[in-house]
């Protein structure tokens, strides 16, 4: 095996509470398995993996990945430009096309945790406890319009989450600026942090990324239909998946960022930066969902 002059390692050893959550959600197993089994045929830009190991007994693992310096990260709360959004959507299209309707994905148990009865029960049991506490935490910080939207969404969550139609592919599951790097070389974005990779609906990644990446909701409103059309063209499966279908799935998926922000805020270790970041993510995604009338899918 050749030695590499530059590499970056990720060793999964954090505070016990964080490790317990990660173990319960299979996060470390998912990421190491992605690099072992699926990254070699991923057309999106991801770091090369030189070594991976996961111990299911302890939940510890190691990844040694390609060093991506001098690539840069854009802070989540800052948001990014429409050009940078386009760069990421190009990679999202490449990712989704690589595994489009590939039923072999279902043979990997670690890739189906997010759609398993175990995960559905986890979320269904957590939401009635987490959402009221989330509202209490952000009272006075988050708009009442957003709270009202959340009340309706989570009262109808079983209906919202019960989606049985649509294209299937490998999705990143947490496609946002904190999990990306940008490089001037070939003007490409690099996708990192695959702990939430899953079999899922492709527009979940797209809506989540667009909603959380524009600091100004007016900019998002002006650009998002064009950006989704660009993604759909790059996906190049028009014969089986029309733009109208993609746009409808995008509108429905606009809740994804809000749900992720609420749950993440309540299960990860709390910090001042984390509190504000999850508030910003929830706001951006909620304004997107309200603008796109996503509640019409469940009411």
Question: Which residues fall in each region the model found?
Answer:
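Conserved catalytic motifs of the protein kinase core domain
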Residues: 7-8, 60-61, 166-168, 187-188
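ATP-dependent phospho-/nucleotidyl transfer catalytic cores
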Residues: 72-172, 184, 273, 277-299
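Catalytic activation segment of kinase domains across protein kinase-like and atypical kinase folds
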Residues: 178-209
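Active-site activation/catalytic loop segments of kinase-like enzymes and analogous catalytic loops
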Residues: 33, 199-238, 254-276
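Helix-rich C-terminal or lid/interface subdomains of diverse kinases
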Residues: 86, 233-299
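Hydrophobic HxD+1 residue recognition
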Residues: 175
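Single conserved hydrophobic/aromatic residue that forms the stacking wall/gate
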Residues: 1-12
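ATP-binding pocket architecture of kinase catalytic cores
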Residues: 10, 14-29, 36-110
């Amino acid at each position: 095996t050749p030695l590499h002059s530059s590499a970056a390692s990720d060793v999964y050893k954090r505070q016990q509470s964080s490790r317990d959550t990660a173990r319960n959600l299979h996060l470390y197993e998912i990421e190491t398995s992605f690099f072992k089994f699926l990254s070699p045929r991923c057309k999106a830009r991801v770091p090369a993996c030189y070594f991976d190991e996961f111990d299911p007994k302890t939940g510890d693992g190691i990844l040694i990945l390609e060093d991506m310096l001098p690539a840069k990260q854009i802070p989540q709360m800052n948001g990014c430009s429409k050009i940078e959004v386009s760069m990421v959507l190009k990679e999202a299209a490449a990712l989704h096309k690589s595994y489009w309707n590939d039923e072999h994905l279902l043979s990997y148990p670690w890739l189906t945790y997010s759609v398993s009865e175990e995960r559905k029960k986890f979320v269904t049991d957590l939401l009635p406890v987490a959402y009221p506490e989330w509202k209490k935490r952000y009272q006075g910080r988050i708009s009442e319009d957003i709270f009202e939207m959340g009340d309706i969404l989570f009262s109808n969550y079983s209906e919202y989450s019960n989606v049985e139609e649509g294209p299937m592919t490998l999705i990143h599951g947490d496609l946002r600026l904190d999990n990306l790097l940008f490089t001037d070389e070939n003007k490409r974005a690099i996708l990192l942090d695959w702990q939430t990779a899953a079999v899922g609906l492709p527009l979940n990644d797209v809506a989540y990324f667009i909603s959380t990446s524009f600091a100004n909701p007016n900019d998002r409103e002006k650009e998002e239909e064009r950006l989704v059309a660009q993604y759909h063209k790059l996906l190049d499966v028009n014969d089986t998946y029309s733009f109208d279908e993609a746009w409808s799935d995008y509108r429905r998926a606009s809740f994804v960022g809000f749900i992720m922000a609420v749950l993440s805020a309540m299960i990860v270790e709390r910090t001042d930066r984390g509190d504000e970041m999850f508030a910003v993510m929830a706001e951006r995604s909620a304004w997107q969902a309200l603008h796109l009338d996503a509640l019409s899918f469940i009411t």
